Amino acid sequence: MKPIIPPQNLSELLERANMMAGISLAQIAAHRGIAVPKDLKRDKGWVGQLIEMELGATAGSKPEQDFLHLGVELKTIPIDSKGKPLETTYVCVAPLTNIEGLTWQDSLVCHKLQRVLWVPVEGERHIPVGDRRVGTPILWEPDLQEQRLLQQDWEEIMELIALGKVEKLTARHGEVLQLRPKAANSKALTQSIAEDGSLKMTNPRGFYLKTAFTAMLLNKVFG
């Protein structure tokens, strides 16, 4: 199957996303000639990759927005029957070294969350993967209050990383943004700042949006 040409503009992207609303993942996968996994235990990113492919996203795993030419990040969000998010939303890998002078405005979190196309997808486990339907997409830009909350959490987390306290950061830190170990394999290691300012090895960390925050975003649109 030929890769889909990236959308030329925002209205084309939204048109593609709206055309998926109400369609099952099996229908999209069949159209792309892709097998549907029995479950997502070993294919956690499968839904997101399928939606990326269908919409013509270009970034892949690169540290930039999925539709860089449009300034849009794509996020699929698994929801329950009441439209509530079922899990936190991964944003990006957290930098653990060389962070002196890094500001919120220059951070990858800020860059990725400037404009997000949220694509809700049914995610309850009793629904077979292929039968799960895609919901109505939402194009979101953080308002001043949301920006403030995100920036505040990011700055507090980064300050603790700079002080060598990354191990003391738990998923409970942050009102809307949290830091968690990223690697599926707990043996994966990367460098981070130690409390004495030297470098030490630790598990890679990622930034995630808490479900209370994404639930608030969905609720603003769907009520």
Curated annotation (Swiss-Prot):
Superkingdom, natural source: Bacteria
Pfam families noted in UniProt: MutH
Main subcellular location of this protein, as a coarse class: cytoplasm
GO biological process: DNA modification; mismatch repair
Annotated localization: Cytoplasm
Gene Ontology terms for molecular function: DNA binding; endonuclease activity
CDD domains: MutH-like
Entry keyword Disulfide bond: no
Keywords: Cytoplasm, DNA damage, DNA repair, Endonuclease, Hydrolase, Nuclease
GO CC list: cytoplasm
Disulphide-bridged cysteine pairs: none
Family: Belongs to the MutH family.
Role played: Sequence-specific endonuclease that cleaves unmethylated GATC sequences. It is involved in DNA mismatch repair.
Protein name: DNA mismatch repair protein MutH
Organism: Shewanella sp. (strain ANA-3)
